[in-house]
């Protein structure tokens, strides 16, 4: 079995384990980093550790490395202040999740594995608020387009994609 195939297998096994038995946490940045550590510890020595270099992808610049910690504090403090979006009606919930998705996507705190970490964290957060989301029903290409648009300040498509998948 090739190294690349082995890496894919390890990621799938860890994601499956996380789905079966979610990591306990209080939906703070430490919890977010713990999910990354859990998902990628078999692949990267630096799993769960913040990147120290600036990143961009497909024309999108992510949070400067030196700003990750202060930005994360703002994002996760706001999440706590909003009571983790519990008790919100569907439309308001989707609006908040869309905003949270955008801000954590911009944060992009790790060198690799940001998307999988973000989806795993969001799944747990959404479930804790009494909703669910099935990522397998989300068109990956459409999500990527929506994410790129959202990075440019246009969140309509992302809100629609997430809104249709959250129930």
What are the residue ranges of the model-derived segments?
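Helix-hairpin-helix/helix-loop-helix acidic hairpins
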Residues: 64-108
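Acidic, carboxylate-rich catalytic segments that either coordinate divalent cations
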Residues: 43, 148-167
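Short alpha-helical scaffolding segments that buttress acidic/His motifs in well-ordered protein cores
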Residues: 35-40, 97-104, 143, 147
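Single conserved hydrophobic/aromatic residue that forms the stacking wall/gate
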Residues: 1-5, 9
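Short alpha-helix boundary/capping elements
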Residues: 39-45, 105, 126, 130
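Hydrophobic (often cysteine-bearing) scaffold residues that line and stabilize catalytic clefts
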Residues: 28, 32, 114, 118, ...
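A glycine-rich, hydrophobic loop/mini-helix early in the fold
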Residues: 29-79
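Short conserved catalytic/interaction loops centered on acidic-Pro-aromatic/His motifs
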Residues: 108-141
């Amino acid at each position: 079995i090739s190294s690349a195939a082995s890496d894919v297998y390890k990621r799938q096994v860890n994601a499956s384990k996380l789905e079966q038995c979610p990591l306990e946490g209080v939906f703070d940045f430490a919890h977010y980093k713990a999910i990354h550590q859990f998902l990628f510890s078999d692949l990267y020595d630096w799993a769960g550790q913040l990147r120290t270099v600036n990143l961009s992808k497909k024309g999108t610049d992510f949070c400067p490395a030196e700003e990750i910690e202060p930005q994360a504090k703002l994002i996760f403090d706001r999440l706590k202040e909003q009571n983790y979006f519990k008790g919100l009606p569907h439309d308001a919930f989707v609006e908040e999740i869309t905003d949270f998705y955008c801000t954590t996507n911009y944060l992009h705190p790790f060198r690799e594995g940001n998307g999988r970490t973000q989806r795993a964290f969001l799944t747990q957060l959404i479930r804790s608020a009494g909703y669910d989301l099935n990522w397998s029903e989300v068109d990956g290409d459409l999500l990527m387009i929506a994410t790129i648009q959202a990075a440019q300040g246009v969140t309509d498509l992302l809100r629609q994609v997430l809104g249709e998948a959250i129930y």
